[in-house]
Amino acid sequence: MLSNSMQRCCQLLAAAILASGLYACGGSGGGSASTASVKGDTVHGKELYATCEGCHKLAENSVGPMHCGLFGRPAGTVPGFEYSEAMKASGIVWDAQKLDEFLVSPIAYVNGTKMGFAGFESATDRADVIAYLQHANKDPALCPAK
């Protein structure tokens, strides 16, 4: 059983993933889901992401994999992180839409994932976390080039 803080962390991450997906599905403009920016509140997203930091870090692996380089990356491929077979075999390539879908209920989206997060019910919270992750991934101070 995961602690409440780890469950909340997973919920916040899931919310971020889901929020990205919602924007990609309903956004305007012709950008693809992997490159379109989510119209979320990055300040609120950063606050929500603080809870995720019990399991995840932006630029390094922890209990969960790092989030720098998340968008456009195939699931289960961060070097040095031990993923579940289910995640490695999922075929997911992370973009805002996939992240949003995943964050609704990670366990249901990837049956067999190690991520013990119930998910984010709030589409707004998901969008905000995803917007923050997109912002962070473009900021070399947060996600330095390797």
What are these regions (language model features)?
Residues 42-46, 57, 61-95, 116-117:
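Gly/Gly-Pro-rich "capping" loops immediately C-terminal to redox-active cysteine motifs
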Residues 9-11, 26, 53-56, 144:
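Secreted/luminal cysteine- and crosslink-motif detector
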Residues 95-144:
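C-terminal capping alpha-helices of c-type cytochrome domains
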Residues 21-24:
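C-terminal motif of bacterial Sec signal peptides marking the signal peptidase cleavage site
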Residues 16-19:
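Short, linear, compositionally biased motifs with a strong N-terminal bias
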Residues 26-48, 144-146:
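Electrostatic cytochrome c docking/interface patches
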Residues 45, 49-58, 129, 133:
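The canonical Cys-X-X-Cys-His
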Residues 2-14:
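Bacterial N-terminal signal peptides that target proteins for export
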